[in-house]
Amino acid sequence: MHLKVNRVIKWLILTVIAIVTLVIVALTVSPWPSAYLVSRLFSGPVVIQDATSYDVAKQHVIIQKNILYPSYQSKNTLDVYTPKGMSKPTTLVIWVHGGGYVGGDKSGVQEFATRLVNDTHVAFISINYQTAPAAIYPSQVKQLNDAVLFLKKDARLRERYNFQQTILGGDSAGAQIALQYAAVQTNSQYAKSLGMARVLHVNQLRATVSYCGPLDLQQIRHEKSASIMMKWFINTVAWSELGTQKWQSSTALQQVSLVQHVNKAFPPTYITDGNIYSFQSQGMAFANRLRELDVSVESRFFNAQSEKVSHEYQFNYKTKIAQQTYIETRNFVNRFK
């Protein structure tokens, strides 16, 4: 009997070792397992934070969901938010959702989009795109281009939207994608390096908005974190998006780091970020570079002595800091629409 118990214990130990070994191997030879786990963080249901304001706003907004746009990539759908009673072509806000490049969905900004359309009378386009690692850089910025081309070429849409007044924006990874696309439209050499033609004229691009965007990604090579989970998260996202385990030395990392690719033609920009578990130092570097170029910038950051403000804080409308950021964003859009 004692011998049988020992055999069972030994078998269990060997099984656990085998499973742990397989997990470690899976996590080190491919980004897919870790990317799946990270994507689950962004897969929860959409929760309305300020139901009172949202319920009022949605009475005055028309939402068309899951419109298909031509693209070689999948997840090529978009949602359109327009003010009711729109009598003339209106300013167009094109928004790219966040999710660490590996997750997220266009529906995540439903509350924000509905309120902004009601308050500013712009049209708001929320775009889906194929996430990493199924599609690696620069797939997402090129898929955004597919969506913009669709919006410009569709005759019915051209009658409703004023492409002479286009605002690009995004949150988290989507902010980086959106502002990279803005850099492509305003920097011919940069566009050439990505093999992309410019679709929007400089004068058509009125402004950009970055909510917690990683705008200077090369900084993460030098950042030290005591958190194993944070290191794992960063490595997963970078490996998945840039397509190489040696992402720290990749040319793609330099290309997606936008501070060195903007010029004086870049449009006026609103930037905000939190001071923990986010990319505030990258946002600050980007804002400082724009100011050096005499580009109009409005920013909202939080110093270390202020309260802790986490990544994507701006959508938690139950908090005063999110409410204030929304007001600043609304005023910014009204000024440049």
Language-model-detected regions and their locations in the chain:
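Tryptophan-rich substrate-binding surfaces of secreted polymer-degrading and adhesive proteins
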Residues: M1
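Alpha/beta-hydrolase superfamily serine-hydrolase fold, recognizing
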Residues: K4, V8-K337
